[in-house]
Amino acid sequence: MKRVFLWLIFVLAFHKLLAEKIGDIASVVGVRDNQLIGYGLVIGLNGTGNKSGSKFTMQSISNMLESVNVKISADDIKSKNVAAVMITASLPPFARQGDKIDIHISSIGDAKSIQGGTLVMTPLNAVDGNIYALAQGAIISGNSSNLLSANIINGATIEREVSYDLFHKNAMTLSLKNPNFKNAIQVQNTLNKVFGNKVAIALDPKTIQITRPERLSMVEFLALVQEIPINYSAKNKIIVDEKSGTIVSGVDIIVHPIVVTSQDITLKITKEPLNDSKNMQDLDNNMSLDTAHNTLSSNGKNITIAGVVKALQKIGVSAKGMVSILQALKKSGAISAEMEIL
């Protein structure tokens, strides 16, 4: 029987003080991307475009030809070399007229492939209805598994800028990426210590209002703020991707002694040393596993998620079974951490 293992990746260290820059844990409110969207046509396809019965595509071709003074009814157009597509893009903050941005193209009709075609000039609109960019370009993609979508690097040119006067602002707002009362106060106190009292004030667990010192412009102030190191507290969290079989966890999340049963699997977690037996295996970090009785011992020390997952792998538990056991441990209170199942 094929065994499915989950790989335990320790890339996050939770529930401890972590040294980071303020710019890594907080964003500046108002400084963000804006989403753009447009409807267009991809031409030059070798019979892989929308079928002639696709009325909205034929009408779009007719409208495009009419824009260049070629009048023809949509009913008279018979072509499989054109595909109707939607174009999406992100307009970065402070993008200037003439800048280039990447675009993503997706077929919306019954085309078989848009690879090798050319996107004709397409306006990209924001939620306010205004045109902010024009998209156009050849579609070249090495992704043979998906023939109905593609990216064009620098495929759109900015035509309209989002007006935002940062230079003359006196106050801005920082938004913590992971809201936390302690972290908000930590940012407030750190900034006040560096720049002087009343520069920063925490409004809630997520929001810190900052006021620039008179000697600095807002651009200079934010540049300094983002580089200031800070110790912040992150939450204990376990993220489980059941499809890919990946568990992301802090290295020091403790699992308390317990007996957990899920489906046909029972695992005993204890700090008591195991009796020597031919079924006992030594794991890392002074842990031992009795495979005959599914008992995991830390030999007097704390057991972590790492040890539990390794033990489950040793006794041949499937990916689905591991997820079920981790959920049972969380529900029973044996794990003091948030759990997110993807």
UniProtKB/Swiss-Prot annotation:
Q: List the GO cellular component terms.
A: bacterial-type flagellum basal body, distal rod, P ring; outer membrane-bounded periplasmic space
Q: Name one GO molecular function term.
A: structural molecule activity
First and last residue of the signal peptide: 1-15
Mention any Pfam family matching this sequence: FlgI
- Gene Ontology BP terms: bacterial-type flagellum-dependent cell motility
Keyword terms, alphabetized: Bacterial flagellum, Periplasm, Signal
Q: Where in the cell is it found?
A: Periplasm; Bacterial flagellum basal body
Q: Does the keyword Signal apply?
A: yes
Q: Which family does it belong to?
A: Belongs to the FlgI family.
Instruction: State how it assembles.
Output: The basal body constitutes a major portion of the flagellar organelle and consists of four rings (L,P,S, and M) mounted on a central rod.
The UniProt function text for this chain reads: Assembles around the rod to form the L-ring and probably protects the motor/basal body from shearing forces during rotation.
User: HAMAP family, alphabetically?
Assistant: FlgI
Q: What is this protein called?
A: Flagellar P-ring protein
Q: Which organism is it from?
A: Helicobacter pylori (strain J99 / ATCC 700824)
Upper classification of the source organism reads:
Bacteria, Pseudomonadati, Campylobacterota, Epsilonproteobacteria, Campylobacterales
